Amino acid sequence: MKVTLIAFLTCAAVLVLHTTAAEELEAESQLMGVGMPDTELAAVDEERLFECSVSCEIEKEGNKDCKKKKCKGGWKCKSNMCVKV
């Protein structure tokens, strides 16, 4: 009987700790989404620039006019580069 009680209390304690940690992690991720550090923004900018340039170059190789790939999140393709709208 004591073993069952100890096991039950241990599981309850682990569950409480896990739930608390998950709530803290969720709160941190929401804060990070609101104010992203400059290093993360720079990485996103470089990635969008690369994707846009590569997309336009691939389309130019087919001897057709470059139909620029839509850049997402308030960005547009201009001169083979993604620029903020």
Swiss-Prot record:
Keywords: Disulfide bond, Neurotoxin, Postsynaptic neurotoxin, Secreted, Signal, Toxin. One of its GO terms (molecular function) is toxin activity. Its main location: secreted. Expressed by the venom gland. It is found in: Secreted. GO terms for cellular component: extracellular region; host cell postsynaptic membrane. SUPFAM superfamilies: omega toxin-like. The keyword Transmembrane helix does not apply. Residues 23-48 form a propeptide. Disulfide bonds join C52-C66, C56-C77, C71-C82. The keyword Signal applies. Belongs to the neurotoxin 12 (Hwtx-2) family. 02 (Hwtx-2) subfamily. This is U4-theraphotoxin-Hhn1l. It comes from Cyriopagopus hainanus. The lineage of its organism: Eukaryota, Metazoa, Ecdysozoa, Arthropoda, Chelicerata.
